[in-house]
Amino acid sequence: MKAVCLLSGGMDSSTLAYVAKDMGYHIHALHLNYGQRTEKKELQSATAIARSLSAEEFIPLDLGYFKAFGKSSLTDPAIDVDVFDENRPELPNTYVPFRNANLLSIATSFAESRDADAIFIGVQALDYSGYPDCRPAFIQAFQQVMDLGTADGTHIDLLTPFIGLTKTDILRKGLDLGVPYEHTWSCYQNEEKACGVCGSCHFRQKAFAELGLSDPIPYEE
């Protein structure tokens, strides 16, 4: 069996690639640079994870148009990344408009070209509270798009094993599978030392703390 894994180099996508391999899939890893401010570190992390998995392929692609669009603190350096605030009612400014539809479209093209059986994307329970393109309904709808838009006789499963899990659940699973978390990167803001205050850092640190563990990546003091 073959699977395309969207691999950002973060905690969720890296763990998910290990899960896919554990399920018996041969991994074809796809890393997409959409202009995010930590891309250099993310690419380094994704490359290390793909190597540790002995992936069949690791393909990095550039999607520069997201940077041209702006509207997100991840792609526009003029917008400060939001500090995590669990009481913030509005969409966080780290939302990249309709990003996952773009990523999944490219992953579908790649999967169909490789006769792959599945695509894995690491959306999880905390994501779809803040990001509309991580909602279960969106994933279900995109599965229909894939079924309708690929060649007759083609079926590629869009798999989201983490959609009902918390970051702590994911970390626990990854530790069981031996994911090298020291090679992953989650921070939205920094590439040398994680900021510790963005939403991604917050949930990562919380997961390690809930399991009584120290996060192996460096953080600002």
UniProtKB/Swiss-Prot annotation:
Source superkingdom: Archaea
Cofactor(s) needed by this chain: Zn(2+)
Binding site for ATP: 7-17
Record field: transmembrane: none
Alphabetical list of InterPro entries matching this protein: QueC, Rossmann-like_a/b/a_fold
Catalytic activity reported: 7-carboxy-7-deazaguanine + NH4(+) + ATP = 7-cyano-7-deazaguanine + ADP + phosphate + H2O + H(+)
EC number: 6.3.4.20
Pathway noted in the entry: Purine metabolism; 7-cyano-7-deazaguanine biosynthesis
Entry keyword set: ATP-binding, Ligase, Metal-binding, Nucleotide-binding, Zinc
Cofactor note: Binds 1 zinc ion per subunit.
GO MF, one example: zinc ion binding
Sites where the protein binds Zn(2+): 187, 195, 198, 201
Enzyme class at the top of the EC tree: ligase
PANTHER family with a match to the protein in the record: 7-CYANO-7-DEAZAGUANINE SYNTHASE
Function: Catalyzes the ATP-dependent conversion of 7-carboxy-7-deazaguanine (CDG) to 7-cyano-7-deazaguanine (preQ(0)).
Family: Belongs to the QueC family.
Protein name: 7-cyano-7-deazaguanine synthase
Organism annotation: Methanosphaerula palustris (strain ATCC BAA-1556 / DSM 19958 / E1-9c)
